Amino acid sequence: MVFFACSTILCAQDDSKWSLVREHQQKSFAHTIPPGNYSGITPLGDDVYAMVSDKSDSALYFNVRLYISRQTGELLQAEYLGPQGRVDSVRLDNEAIVRVSDSTVVIASEGKHRLKEYKLDTDSIDNGLWEWSMPSADFYPNYVFESAAYDTVHHRLWTVNESTLRRDGKPATTQDPHNNVLRLIAFDWSNRNASPVSYLYKMDMPTTMKMSMTYVMGVSELCALPDGKLLVLEREAFIPNIKLGAFCQCKLYVVDPEVETPYALDKELEPGAPYVSKRLLASWRTKLGLTKYLWANYEGMCLGPQLENGDQVIVLVSDSQDGYAGVLKDWFKTIVIRKR
């Protein structure tokens, strides 16, 4: 759970070709977007985006139209277009969605520990489409798959476990601070029968050691950039018993898998194992204040439009837990980046 009250973006000194141009303040559209548990988003074209809700036991996804300025990248308005498709089971806890072809999307289910391909714009379920899963025993509770991204350059589908797998240690906490070790997992979409390729990813250390009521630290989403690099969204959410003082630290990193060394998914961690390099693109921290309830637990991220000058918009969406207590909102945020 994450509470937002203020936001500051910090640019990092890195040697990657992507840099931050500007951020826009988060916005909610309570009059046009109904409360939900929106945890993933992907573009469908013509300013339409599909979003999954991790609590939906009926609709597969929900379409919205986002009106984003082609000059500045600011999100101007959002329009709800309604539910689409139907789920093939209950308690799927769908956390991420990504378009992988003109007619299909892949959805990451935390409840089923799987990634599964679905047809767009239909209520029928084709069980002959691609599906992949891992044993539930590999994961700690609520730390499964929260991410999905598709690289159109190299035709790869990406995901990552939200926090440390059991074989790799324990998830970091405020009382046991350490670097979570994750497995970035890539599937060759031109040869889907091939075994996935994985890479070791090391998260940053926790920024607090205070006692908490709720503490969540993990990668909440991936996004493939137009050149095949990956954006990795690290999220640290700290909530004390009194709620005041709660914060969420979000860090957006760029990773270039093309220059990294794979590490087998089923291989135990060994001393000297290769971790991918990461470069900080942006960082923001949000807090719960006495009078401001700008909660924004960002769990969805995807490419937005390119601006008239060629800059790239990144769209983020938060999970309001269905407008929890009438206070939390479904926030949207856009940032603009540039390849130099």
Predicted regions located by residue number:
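Bacterial Sec-dependent N-terminal signal peptides
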Residues: 1-17
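Sequence/structural signature of beta-propeller domains
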Residues: 13-340
